[in-house]
């Protein structure tokens, strides 16, 4: 749908003469305050101690951050505008089954707190991909880094453009004005202020996100008769879903899909994603990092609850006040904005507050992307090749990288404007890549016999499967003549006397189930991470064992999950040998506090480097203990 965007007081679309609600001056002021305050916070941290900044302070906030700001930043990083718009639309169209996603948050945050954080924190890393070099080799590290850069570069442009497009279509808010304003402001405070500025602006933006959604819930519930009436209307029309225990992984949303498939999605975000790992490592202690992960749990539940309540309030509102034909045909990501403009049109400033809430989600996501991309580029791709960089030049280069990625983001936003139907494919790339990266880290932490070749082949296979299923699913849906109807009884193409329960009953008999490759492509998106990470682990293990496992290689004990030695000690000796856990019938020393160091050439130094240097007479201190693993094959 083409939208005319001008300076006139009202806007119309090319396919309808209906006047679109517009922003008042007060709304623009409220939205502008978000940008100004975010910029002020960033510039404050940039100017504070100017001239005394270090690379560690710029990229890692000097590793002195407290639990609460890190927790709110962790929440804000992936609480994007897409989630703020998509969650309520999901509830409005398909019912409350989506709410069970909250069940996945417990394990999805408990596992990172007690498995990934201890390993990463005790290795004293800056980039999560440094772990891959310590565990495998430099080639695996570069593969992981390049994969992450591709994932984030594609996503951040779409994450900036998509909400701006939805806002423009509904309110007439100038598309490229919002894109440029957000991109430039985010670019400035991220490049100059570093991670500390990003974290503290995330705190501010999280509060704005909660406030904006809370206002919509309160005002909307008041207009339709209270939350009790909202729930009664939703229940009357079958919108309140029971627990769907169908184990079929090809059903889009069931309890098992949401509660367990969602765990793997959470692990790919909160376990191994550089943006989140960087925040854990910026904490002043390992305990603070773990507590910040705990603190995200109630915050995530509140965010999910508010998102779902907005969907229910929206449903009750449009049962009382009818939709216009344009709204009935609107894209799902526009429904919430139409609702907000209808609900708050007589309250100047409140539409601006919700838009500030919406773009707070975008700012937090994009700034995290800029900062994490600058960090991995500096640590994984530049530092090893230019080891003689002075502190001053390293700081300038780090800031330049963040600024450069900001320009790339604006460029990707422009590219996104020409993608058309491929836009959904670009958004899906973020989810496709997360699963294989999760599998790569799990392969290293839990399987001592995995070798570098197995890791690389496993990652490439996982990525191939991810793109095959993901893109195949998108193409299949686009080419399908009959799409599943939304389950809300108010859509223009459903009879008014049908409810969610009625449609749900009719669907099995009216819609044929896909077969063959079509069924394969219909795998629920929440199982993507589980499927792709499992593929990486399975293929990685098979290739590793076929190629001799860790034949004659030393294994840095700090790269293995600390509890794993105790668990493997319970296995028979023959199993321990096959898993590379015993060498020459002797116990292998377990050391979990082994810290990597940076050598003069910018590369990582661990116990293997120290051994070689000791043999060459370059160092005289004792070598740190390592695993020497035996030959292993099938």
Swiss-Prot record:
Cell membrane in keyword set: yes
GO MF entry, a single one: vitamin transmembrane transporter activity
Any one GO biological process: biotin transport
Keywords noted in UniProt: Biotin, Cell membrane, Glycoprotein, Ion transport, Membrane, Sodium, Sodium transport, Symport, Transmembrane, Transmembrane helix, Transport
GO CC aspect terms: apical plasma membrane; basal plasma membrane; basolateral plasma membrane; brush border membrane; plasma membrane
Transmembrane segments: 23-43, 65-85, 100-120, 142-162, 175-195, 207-227, 255-275, 295-315, 350-370, 403-423, 427-447, 455-475, 526-546
Subcellular location: Cell membrane; Apical cell membrane
Reactions catalysed, as given in the entry: biotin(out) + 2 Na(+)(out) = biotin(in) + 2 Na(+)(in); (R)-pantothenate(out) + 2 Na(+)(out) = (R)-pantothenate(in) + 2 Na(+)(in); (R)-lipoate(out) + 2 Na(+)(out) = (R)-lipoate(in) + 2 Na(+)(in); iodide(out) + 2 Na(+)(out) = iodide(in) + 2 Na(+)(in)
Tissue specificity of this protein: Expressed in the jejunum (at protein level). Expressed in lung, skeletal muscle, heart, brain, kidney, intestine, liver, and placenta.
Pfam family, one: SSF
InterPro entries in UniProt: Na/Glc_symporter_sf, Na/solute_symporter, Na/solute_symporter_CS, Sodium:Solute_Symporter_SSF
PROSITE patterns per record: NA_SOLUT_SYMP_1 (PS00456), NA_SOLUT_SYMP_3 (PS50283)
Main location group: membrane
Topology within the bilayer: Multi-pass membrane protein
Glycan-modified residues: 488, 497
Annotated NCBIfam families: sss (TIGR00813)
Subunit structure: Interacts with PDZD11.
Function: Sodium-dependent multivitamin transporter that mediates the electrogenic transport of pantothenate, biotin, lipoate and iodide. Functions as a Na(+)-coupled substrate symporter where the stoichiometry of Na(+):substrate is 2:1, creating an electrochemical Na(+) gradient used as driving force for substrate uptake. Required for biotin and pantothenate uptake in the intestine across the brush border membrane. Plays a role in the maintenance of intestinal mucosa integrity, by providing the gut mucosa with biotin.
Sequence similarity: Belongs to the sodium:solute symporter (SSF) (TC 2.A.21) family.
Domain notes: The C-terminal tail is important for biotin uptake as well as apical localization in polarized cells.
Name used for this protein in its record: Sodium-dependent multivitamin transporter
């Amino acid at each position: 749908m083409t939208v005319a965007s001008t300076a006139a007081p009202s806007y119309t679309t090319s396919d309808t003469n209906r006047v679109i609600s517009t922003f008042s001056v007060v709304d623009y002021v409220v939205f502008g305050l978000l940008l100004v305050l975010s910029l002020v916070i960033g510039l404050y941290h940039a100017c504070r101690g100017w001239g005394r900044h270090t690379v560690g302070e710029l990229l890692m906030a000097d590793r002195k951050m407290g639990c609460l700001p890190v927790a709110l930043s962790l929440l804000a990083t992936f609480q994007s505008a897409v989630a703020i718009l998509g969650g309520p639309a999901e509830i409005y169209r398909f019912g409350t089954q989506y709410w069970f996603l909250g069940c996945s948050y417990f394990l999805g945050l408990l596992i990172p707190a007690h498995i990934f954080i201890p390993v990463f924190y005790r290795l004293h890393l800056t980039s999560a991909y440094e772990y891959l070099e310590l565990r495998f080799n430099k080639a695996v590290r570069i593969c992981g880094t390049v994969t992450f850069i591709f994932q984030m570069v594609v996503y951040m442009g779409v994450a900036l453009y998509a909400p701006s497009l939805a806002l423009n279509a509904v309110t007439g808010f100038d598309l490229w004005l919002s894109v440029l304003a957000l991109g430039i402001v985010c670019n400035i405070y991220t490049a100059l202020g570093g991670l500390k500025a990003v974290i503290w602006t995330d705190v501010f933006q999280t509060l704005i996100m909660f406030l904006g959604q809370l206002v919509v819930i309160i005002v909307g519930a008041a207009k339709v008769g209270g939350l009790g009436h909202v729930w009664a209307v939703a229940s009357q029309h079958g919108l309140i879903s029971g627990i769907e225990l169908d184990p079929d992984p090809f059903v889009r949303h069931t309890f098992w899909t949401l509660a367990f498939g969602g765990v793997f999605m959470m692990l790919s975000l909160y376990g191994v994603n550089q943006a989140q790992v960087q925040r854990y490592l910026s904490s002043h202690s390992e305990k603070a990092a773990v507590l910040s992960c705990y603190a995200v749990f109630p915050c995530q539940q509140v965010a999910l609850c508010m998102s779902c309540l907005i969907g229910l309030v929206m449903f009750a509102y449009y049962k009382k006040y009818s939709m216009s034909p344009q709204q009935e045909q609107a894209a799902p990501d526009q429904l919430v904005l139409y609702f907000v403009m209808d609900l708050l049109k007589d309250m100047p400033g409140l539409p601006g507050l919700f838009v500030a809430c919406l773009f707070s989600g975008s700012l937090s996501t994009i700034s995290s992307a800029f900062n994490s991309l600058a960090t991995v580029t500096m640590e994984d791709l530049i530092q090893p090749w230019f080891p003689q960089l002075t502190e001053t030049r390293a700081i300038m280069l780090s800031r330049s990288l963040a600024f450069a990625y900001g320009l790339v983001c604006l460029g990707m936003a422009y590219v996104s404007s020409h993608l058309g139907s491929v836009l959904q494919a670009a958004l899906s790339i973020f989810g496709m890549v997360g699963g294989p990266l999760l599998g790569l880290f799990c392969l290293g932490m839990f399987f001592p016999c995995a070798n570098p070749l197995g890791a690389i082949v496993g990652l490439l296979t996982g990525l191939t499967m991810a793109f095959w299923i993901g893109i195949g699913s998108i193409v299949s849906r686009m080419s399908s003549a009959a799409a599943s109807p939304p389950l809300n009884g108010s859509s223009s193409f459903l009879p008014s006397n049908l409810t969610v329960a009625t449609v749900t009953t009719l669907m099995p008999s009216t819609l044929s189930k896909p077969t063959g490759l079509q069924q394969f492509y219909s795998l629920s998106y929440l199982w993507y991470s589980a499927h792709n990470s499992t593929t990486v682990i399975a293929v990685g293990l098979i290739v590793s064992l076929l190629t001799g496992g860790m034949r004659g290689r030393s294994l840095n004990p700090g790269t293995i999950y600390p509890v794993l030695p105790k668990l493997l000690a319970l296995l028979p000796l023959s199993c321990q040998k096959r898993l590379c856990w015993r060498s020459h019938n002797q116990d292998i020393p377990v050391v979990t506090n082994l810290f990597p160091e940076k050598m003069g050439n910018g590369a990582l130094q661990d116990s293997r480097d120290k051994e070689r240097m000791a043999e060459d007479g370059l160092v005289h201190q004792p070598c740190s203990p390592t695993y020497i693993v035996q030959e292993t094959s099938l």
